[in-house]
Regions:
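Acidic, low-complexity/disordered tracts enriched in E/D and polar residues
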Residues: 1-50, 73, 125, 133, ...
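Short glycine-enriched, charge-decorated loop/helix-capping segments at active-site entrances
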Residues: 29, 170-177, 263-269, 451
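Long, charge-rich, low-complexity alpha-helical segments
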Residues: 35-142
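Alpha-helical scaffolding segments of alpha/beta enzyme cores, especially the outer helices
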Residues: 74, 185, 210-220, 236, ...
């Protein structure tokens, strides 16, 4: 006879929309989210009514939903296999054993099952969160920039108030930040609008004293959360974080060479500390990305981060399209952005999302739809700054409202600038989408706004990357050219000249941060 009693694991959370018969359900140790529709959605909805580690009787679910036990039994067996229910009460020992199994599986998967180039490319991707959002709508995802304070001083940081050398004065903390009561109210208001997931970032979120209170509030409310951090504030606290079951932790690692990483962070010993935290999180099976911006100082060694990720069962996340500061400092594009020759080589790395090669459709080019807005921020997702400004995303600092004084729903439904943004199409942009190289642009209206004070005018950063990718793709397609010259990526990177440190400094231009959109212009 099949088991009639199950338990809801402590590592699960999710949300059911009964009206739409749609449910999202997370296994927060494996880091996998599942989307359910129709009757299966309603069954998972019954599970979510039960507190974590609470008892679930199939007979009660059967009676509540008028579904036969014969139909429920195999479904619950599948849920048990996926770690979405447990056939026994979830003790601390069971959690530890499950973490150990998942951690070992993650490492073995990375080591024994290398992904093909096609599998790595970010085309035609779909996931449970997208499916749920498409079906239900509302505000489902929000990023909280908890503070711009940080335990590192990265030379490429785009945050307002960041410095480029130790003689410059940081103004990261020059703002009146939201309080814990503010966050609880805002989270409650967002939940009423459909919230299922939050990302906690900064600066570094653990530079915010109340971060653990916010995490506990999210956990108790059943909201999945990600954390983007350098790890410095997690020393001796990784188990504490793991016990709140983050959906994902992103750790910034810039090289496999400690001195290169520390040069970028401007904090001696930061590589060792971040790596120790990453190793501990890996052992605890906390889903993890290793985040790495590729720039001149680390171009010869950035690839080592992929090796580290493989050892830890993590996913490497590389960014080659570096952006200038939100407040108009041009230092990054002036001193740190890859040269044309360096960028051509790096774009042949299939770990790079902007990869150029025959495995990608049109060698990485994608035709832009002129009748749609090229950016999805500000529809179902937003960012909230440390002082409470509601903005489209962390790269796009135009203000739709001020949450210390306004209600989320009021801004979401009544803000004229937000309505204008949501109804924009690429046809209304001045240049974007009108050139042959635009197919190779990872168009960011936020970059446009930082540079020009409007999302409608093309930014130099966007165009630079698009033109390099376009030229490389067409030389490869039409001339048989390959910047690797028959060598491996790592061989070509090793042939690049060593980086010569230079004194970098702010180069301020216009500051358009935290202003409202100009409607119709």
């Amino acid at each position: 006879m099949s088991n009639d009693i199950y338990y809801r694991p402590t590592w699960t959370c999710g949300r059911c929309n009964a009206e739409k018969q749609a449910t999202i359900y997370y296994n927060l140790i494996t880091g996998i989210s599942y989307y359910f529709e129709d009757f299966s959605a309603m069954v998972i909805g019954e599970l979510l009514r039960v507190p974590r580690n609470g008892e679930i009787r199939m007979q009660d679910v059967s009676a509540s939903l008028n579904i036969s036990m014969e139909s429920l039994s195999p479904f619950f067996t599948q849920l048990d296999q996926l770690g979405l229910v447990s056939s026994t009460p979830v003790t601390e020992n069971i959690v530890d054993e499950y973490r150990t199994r998942v951690s070992e599986y993650n490492r073995l998967q990375q080591l024994s099952t290398p992904r093909s180039t096609q599998e790595k490319l970010p085309y035609e991707t779909s996931n449970a969160e997208m499916l749920y959002t498409d079906k239900v709508g509302g505000i489902t995802s929000v990023m909280f920039e908890l503070t711009y304070n940080c335990s590192e001083k990265c030379i490429h940081c785009y945050n307002i108030g960041a410095t480029r050398n130790d003689n410059e004065k940081s103004t990261r903390g020059n703002r009146s930040e939201l309080t814990l009561d503010d966050y609880k109210r805002i989270i409650d208001e967002l939940y009423e609008q459909g919230l299922i997931k939050v990302c906690l970032t900064g600066g570094d979120p653990f530079s915010k004293p109340i971060v653990w209170d916010i995490i506990e509030y999210l956990y108790n409310k059943g909201i999945a959360f990600d954390v983007y951090t350098n790890g410095q504030g997690l020393i001796n606290k990784t188990k504490k974080l793991a016990n709140y079951y983050p959906r994902l932790v992103g750790i910034s690692i810039y090289s496999g060479i400690p001195e290169v990483h520390d040069y970028i962070t401007r904090i001696k010993g930061s590589w060792d500390k971040s790596m120790n935290v990453a190793r501990e999180l890996s052992a605890l099976a906390v889903p993890m990305n290793l985040k790495c911006c590729v720039m001149r100082p680390n171009v010869k060694t950035y690839y080592m981060v992929a090796d580290i990720a493989q050892e830890l069962g993590a996913v490497p996340q590389f960014e080659v399209s570096l952006t200038d500061s939100i407040e108009g400092d041009k230092c990054v594009s002036r001193f740190l952005r890859l040269t044309d020759d360096e960028l051509e080589i790096v774009l042949r790395d299939d770990n790079i999302p902007l990869y150029v090669g025959k495995e990608a459709p049109n060698y990485g080019g994608q035709t832009k739809l002129m009748t749609q807005n090229p950016c999805g921020a500000g529809y179902n997702s937003f960012c909230i700054t440390p002082e409470g400004n509601l903005i489209p995303c962390c790269a796009f600092h135009t203000v739709f409202g001020y949450l210390k004084a306004q209600d989320v729903a009021d801004i979401n439904h009544n803000c004229k600038e937000l309505s204008y943004w949501r109804n924009l199409t690429l046809n209304e942009y001045e240049e974007c989408g009108r050139h042959d190289y635009c197919a190779y642009c990872n168009l960011c209206p936020g970059n446009n706004f930082v540079e020009h004070g409007t999302p409608l005018k093309a930014s130099e950063n966007n165009c630079y990357m698009a033109k390099i990718r376009f030229k490389l793709a067409h030389k490869m397609m039409n001339e048989g050219y390959d910047p690797l010259n028959g060598k491996t990526l790592r061989e070509r990177l090793s042939e690049l000249p060593d980086y010569t440190p230079v004194r970098i400094h702010k180069e301020m231009s216009h500051n358009f941060s935290d202003i409202k959109l100009k409607i119709n212009g």
